[in-house]
Amino acid sequence: MAVNNFSFTFLGTGTSAGVPVIACDCDVCTSEDPRDKRLRCSACIRFTDAGGIDRVILIDTSPDLRQQVLREKLERCDAILFTHQHVDHTFGLDEVRRFNMVMNQAIDIYAEQATLQHLHRVFNHVFESNKNVNDSFVANLIPNELQPDEPLCLF
């Protein structure tokens, strides 16, 4: 598929605790240098597809996702690719529910089996309607299992 306006943006490149780290007085954490202020790991790919639709693919959903999305002025999310199941890469998943509302559609998520199982366990209120005891607005997600060494075609 031909794409235009392709960009890859690191949304966060910090450690699992972010930088600065809470209650740390080391030189990096107390630095005034803006390069020493780093959010946790996420990234996004933006492009215009062959049909002229602007697309956004998130890579991981860090706990800092809301702040990252606001900073980058992202207004949609067409898919999410999870690299692995660590909480610093998954705990921002709840934030994507606003994209569901804006786009009026579900979001495909892609991950290996172990990561999908982790997401189902941690966010059971999203994947199992009977676990959403308050009937609150939750993300509308479509899980897709990735197979190791197999190509991935999103659109």
Please report, for each region that a protein language model flagged, where it lies by residue.
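Binuclear metal-dependent hydrolase catalytic cores
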Residues: 2-155
